[in-house]
Swiss-Prot record:
NCBIfam families: PRK00595.1, rpmG_bact. It comes from the Bacteria. Belongs to the bacterial ribosomal protein bL33 family. GO terms for molecular function: structural constituent of ribosome. PANTHER family: 54S RIBOSOMAL PROTEIN L39, MITOCHONDRIAL, LARGE RIBOSOMAL SUBUNIT PROTEIN BL33M. This is Large ribosomal subunit protein bL33. GO terms for biological process: translation. It comes from Idiomarina loihiensis (strain ATCC BAA-735 / DSM 15497 / L2-TR). Keywords: Ribonucleoprotein, Ribosomal protein. Signal peptide: none annotated. GO terms for cellular component: cytosolic large ribosomal subunit. It holds the Pfam family Ribosomal_L33.
Amino acid sequence: MRDKIRLVSSAGTGYFYTTDKNKRTMPEKMEIKKFDPVVRKHVIFKEAKIK
């Protein structure tokens, strides 16, 4: 079952990506390093719920 999630920047800019993940194979919270165009750097994005 794939659920939609939101990846929020840890730089505190409020920038986020939306994606989906398979909760059966990956039950823990996702953390991935991606580009944040507001600070123009690669930072860690953490999983949050889509409101």
